[in-house]
Design a protein with these regions (language model features):
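Ankyrin-repeat-protein effector appendages
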Residues: 1-27, 109, 141-142, 151-154, ...
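Conserved ankyrin/ankyrin-like repeat signature
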Residues: 36, 68-69, 101-102, 134-135, ...
């Protein structure tokens, strides 16, 4: 038996090369390169690949607002419920950023409306904190509970008040009567 690699076998990446390649893949998600992600996924790249912070490709693409890349990842069975190491979900990131189209895309593909981070914060709470009135309307229309409390007993309305988010305070006060 020979110690050499046959010519038809690909060369194995070194650990450093693999780490560099992985970082390039995560950058493609951040940049929203849907075509490259589709090509890599079709070659066997795991759809739920995570970086050193626990962020998935889906988390990065959704946070940075790349709906086409998110759709490609979801088509390849990326899980919209995978949280990063801080307990943050893609839907909470999209709500924080104020991206209604992204929130809708994630919900339509299985994201839990009431899914909470480790501290109990939901996407509705994130939207309330940052005056994301359209997202609040959408999430409540889909069944989000405006009376839900985080681990500290804080509701979406409480969070909006704390952050000085006047529009969402008025919206939630009207809704809650």
């Amino acid at each position: 038996m020979s110690d050499t690699t046959p010519a038809d076998q690909p060369r194995q990446m070194t650990p450093g090369e693999a780490a560099d390649f992985a970082e390039q893949v995560f950058n493609k998600a951040r940049e929203g390169d849907a075509a490259m992600l589709a090509a890599l996924l079709s070659k066997g790249l795991p759809a739920n690949l995570r970086n050193h912070k626990g962020d998935t490709l889906l988390m990065l693409a959704s946070y940075h607002g790349h709906v086409d890349a998110v759709k490609v990842l979801l088509e390849h069975k990326a899980d919209p419920e995978v949280r990063n190491d801080n307990g943050q979900s893609p839907i909470a990131g999209a709500a924080f950023k104020g991206n209604l189209e992204m929130v809708k895309t994630l919900v339509e593909n299985g994201a839990d409306i009431e899914g909470a981070s480790f501290d109990g914060r939901t996407a509705l709470m994130m939207a309330a904190m940052f005056n994301r009135t359209e997202i609040i309307e959408y999430l409540i229309g889909k069944g989000a509970d405006p009376k839900a409390k985080d681990a500290n007993g804080i509701t979406a309305l409480d969070a909006a008040r704390t952050m000085g988010a006047a529009e969402t305070v008025a919206q939630l006060e009207k809704l809650l009567g």
